[in-house]
């Protein structure tokens, strides 16, 4: 098996943009420690250097194969190792997926993300999802897939099928990775990210906060993302959704200001990435989401489901966007 570890920036290596430097963990911690209002202001300034602050990229996420995953990730209700009441479902039919994609596009989504609960796909699975990707791409939607660990050649096959993005999150601080995930390691994730980059796919890579981590550990997650070379085009920041039956069902609540800080620090350290306000929005008041947008979040998952958990209804999202004079970003082939 060929190993394609995604290269990290060397400590002495600086890119032409001053904010694309190597980020030491202590530097990221210093950002977290800034006075709240100063941090939000700094993040907003960085955001405006690279994006229209009123434009929001809308993605819809669909679970095309649900439950029964052999992995043991303490946050995930789809693991076969936990009794969460989730019923295992086989792969959806192509026609049903395409119909869901048509609905998503009609409602304003520009990107359609598809997830399958596998440790990694088999060659026969790649053939099936390649057909699905081609059908969704033909609708004029940007495509994203999250299918787990990839073997050699699979990323190239997905690229050939028309996939734009591959989602593969780093989940948490590398130093605590195996406290949360017990059936793979951080290097496994980096290997697949390397395969994805080698194939010419764009990268969607983020993590989850609210899993009883400390602030320095949140800084470690952001540093590990910011030091990917090149940086991810999309960075989803998820707030843990506590699901009964998972080991993290009783995790301590993360203070809302700490989540907003995480969004702001992600924006400052990854100035050209789309920072996605992802899972956990059903528990976020409008004012909190507004602060996240001010701090540089410029993408959301749009639709009533995020794989197996609830998401705000489309109508409530559009109402909030109208209140804030935000508008959905249209998909163009050259967009990140």
Curated annotation (Swiss-Prot):
Subunit structure: Homodimer.
Any GO BP annotation: biotin biosynthetic process
Superkingdom per UniProt: Bacteria
EC numbers, comma separated: 2.8.1.6
Cofactor(s) this protein requires: [4Fe-4S] cluster; [2Fe-2S] cluster
Residues at which [4Fe-4S] cluster binds: 69, 73, 76
PANTHER family: BIOTIN SYNTHASE, BIOTIN SYNTHASE, MITOCHONDRIAL
Every Radical SAM core domain range: 54-281
Matching Pfam families: BATS (PF06968), Radical_SAM (PF04055)
Record HAMAP family: BioB
EC primary class: transferase
GO molecular function, one term: 4 iron, 4 sulfur cluster binding
The protein's annotated pathway: Cofactor biosynthesis; biotin biosynthesis; biotin from 7,8-diaminononanoate: step 2/2
Keyword Transferase in annotation: yes
Keyword S-adenosyl-L-methionine among record annotations: yes
Name of the protein in its database record: Biotin synthase
Binding-site residues, [2Fe-2S] cluster: 113, 144, 204, 276
Organism: Actinobacillus pleuropneumoniae serotype 5b (strain L20)
CC cofactor note: Binds 1 [4Fe-4S] cluster. The cluster is coordinated with 3 cysteines and an exchangeable S-adenosyl-L-methionine. Binds 1 [2Fe-2S] cluster. The cluster is coordinated with 3 cysteines and 1 arginine.
Role: Catalyzes the conversion of dethiobiotin (DTB) to biotin by the insertion of a sulfur atom into dethiobiotin via a radical-based mechanism.
Alphabetized InterPro entries for the sequence: Aldolase_TIM (IPR013785), BATS_dom (IPR010722), Biotin_synth/BioAB (IPR002684), Biotin_synthase (IPR024177), Elp3/MiaA/NifB-like_rSAM (IPR006638), rSAM (IPR007197)
Protein family per UniProt: Belongs to the radical SAM superfamily. Biotin synthase family.
Catalytic activity: (4R,5S)-dethiobiotin + (sulfur carrier)-SH + 2 reduced [2Fe-2S]-[ferredoxin] + 2 S-adenosyl-L-methionine = (sulfur carrier)-H + biotin + 2 5'-deoxyadenosine + 2 L-methionine + 2 oxidized [2Fe-2S]-[ferredoxin]
Record keywords: 2Fe-2S, 4Fe-4S, Biotin biosynthesis, Iron, Iron-sulfur, Metal-binding, S-adenosyl-L-methionine, Transferase
CDD domains according to UniProt: Radical_SAM
């Amino acid at each position: 098996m060929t190993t394609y570890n995604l290269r990290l920036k060397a400590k002495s290596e600086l890119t032409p943009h001053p904010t694309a430097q190597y980020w030491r963990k202590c530097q990221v911690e210093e950002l977290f420690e800034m006075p709240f209002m100063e941090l939000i202001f700094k993040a907003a300034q960085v955001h405006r250097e690279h994006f229209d602050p009123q434009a929001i990229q809308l993605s819809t996420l669909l679970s095309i194969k649900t439950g029964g995953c052999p992995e043991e990730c303490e946050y995930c209700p789809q693991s076969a190792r936990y009794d969460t009441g989730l019923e295992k479902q086989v792969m959806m039919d192509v026609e049903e997926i395409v119909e869901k994609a048509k609905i998503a596009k009609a409602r304003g989504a520009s990107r359609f993300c598809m997830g399958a609960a596998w440790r990694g796909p088999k060659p026969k699975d790649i053939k099936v999802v390649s057909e699905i990707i081609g059908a969704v791409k033909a609708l004029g939607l940007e495509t994203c897939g999250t299918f787990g660990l990839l073997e050699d050649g699979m990323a190239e096959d997905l690229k050939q099928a028309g996939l734009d993005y591959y989602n593969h999150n780093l989940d948490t601080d590398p130093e605590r990775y195996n406290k949360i995930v017990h059936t793979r390691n951080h290097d496994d994730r980096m290997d697949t990210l390397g395969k994805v980059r080698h194939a010419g796919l764009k990268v969607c890579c983020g993590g989850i906060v609210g899993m009883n981590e400390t602030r320095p550990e949140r800084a470690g997650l952001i540093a590990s993302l910011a030091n990917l070379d090149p940086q991810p085009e999309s960075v989803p920041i998820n707030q843990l959704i506590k699901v009964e039956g998972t080991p993290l069902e009783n995790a301590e609540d993360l203070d809302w200001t700490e989540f907003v800080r995480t969004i702001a620090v992600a924006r400052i350290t990854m100035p050209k990435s789309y920072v996605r306000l992802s899972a956990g929005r059903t528990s976020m008041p409008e004012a909190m989401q507004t602060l996240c947008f001010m701090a540089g979040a410029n993408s959301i998952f749009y639709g009533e489901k995020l794989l197996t958990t609830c998401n705000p209804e489309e109508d409530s999202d559009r109402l909030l966007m109208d209140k804030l004079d935000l508008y959905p970003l249209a998909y163009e082939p050259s967009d990140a």
